[in-house]
Amino acid sequence: MGRFGYAFQNYDATRHVRSSVREKDMSHKHAREVAVAIKGLSIEKARDYLQAVVNKDRAVAFRRYKNQVGHKADPGMMSGRYPQKTAREFIKVLDNLESNAEYKGMDLDRLKIVNATVHKGVIVKRFIPRAMGRATPKNNVLTHVELVAQEI
């Protein structure tokens, strides 16, 4: 895998800590909604929220990709889902972010997520053979996730 850059601009190594994961097999639409949900939270609150999503105690509000998505009973939420696979991957990125902050000597209680970016990655193209010599495409879009936290 080659070198990559970060989408976050104005990165200051003394104030910010960042972590990323590349080409993970998760829905980029779910990842976008989870990223919006955890932006602005502390690392501990984000981890608790994502663990509640995995346990199906709290839902993630779907604001952009909400067609045919049912309503949830969480306060202040219309459409929502429980993207468990995506939440598990985000917990791993948060763990990496926390270890990077410890390595830099930052105070973990004062860290706040200031940027959560999601990009589409490589498309893994496959096909399903059908009758009469036809084929149906079955594409899998991989996802890049970047998190940046800052000491507040």
Swiss-Prot record:
UniProt-listed Gene3D superfamilies: Ribosomal protein L22/L17
InterPro entries associated with the record: Ribosomal_uL22 (IPR001063), Ribosomal_uL22_euk/arc (IPR005721), Ribosomal_uL22_sf (IPR036394)
Keyword Glycosyltransferase among record annotations: no
A GO CC term attached to the entry: cytosolic large ribosomal subunit
GO molecular function terms attached to this record: rRNA binding; structural constituent of ribosome
Keyword annotations: Ribonucleoprotein, Ribosomal protein, RNA-binding, rRNA-binding
Record keyword ATP-binding present: no
Domain of life: Archaea
UniProt record, GO biological process: cytoplasmic translation
Functional note: This protein binds specifically to 23S rRNA. It makes multiple contacts with different domains of the 23S rRNA in the assembled 50S subunit and ribosome. The globular domain of the protein is located near the polypeptide exit tunnel on the outside of the subunit, while an extended beta-hairpin is found that lines the wall of the exit tunnel in the center of the 70S ribosome.
Assembly with partners or alone: Part of the 50S ribosomal subunit.
HAMAP family: Ribosomal_uL22_A
UniProt similarity note: Belongs to the universal ribosomal protein uL22 family.
Protein name listed in UniProt: Large ribosomal subunit protein uL22
Lineage: Archaea, Nitrososphaerota, Nitrososphaeria, Nitrosopumilales, Nitrosopumilaceae
